[in-house]
Amino acid sequence: MSDSLLIQDFLKPVPMAVILEDEELNDAQLGSHMQIYTDEFPDLEEAEVVLLAVAEERGTGNGVSESDSPDLIRKHLYNLYYWHPDIRLADVGTILPGASLNDTYAAAKTVIAELIAQKKTVIILGGSHDVTLAQYGAYVHHNQVIEASCIDSFINLGTGTSLRSEN
């Protein structure tokens, strides 16, 4: 439990009223079968797959610090049909934004590394592509080789895409 309290310090709860727009989930929907961090941090012992949101957008260079994209993803994800009862899911909330972009990276890396240590499959919702570096750092911390997929609405191949030299 002390590990959960440690990562909870880096997370804010899921705003269920915003996501569900004050509607209730029914038993056929995925969200009604998930352990979700709302008032109390969930017990992750039974969870196999853990959702973690990152709203950080400072790495895009567009002047936006946070995005509501993780909650928009949740809004649709929680409403999906609950089709596979053998997979147990949890949503541990959203990484709190740090004072600097590197602080957010460090928080994300810490939380992800702890979830990996607990043998959880981590799915990150939201965040700009540069947050992938924090995810990678968590696996490096555990000396694990990883394969990563970044799913987005478009592919960033333009010549105007900024690259962060400190990455």
Predicted regions and their residues:
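Conserved alpha-helical scaffold segments that buttress catalytic/binding sites
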Residues: 2-51, 58-167
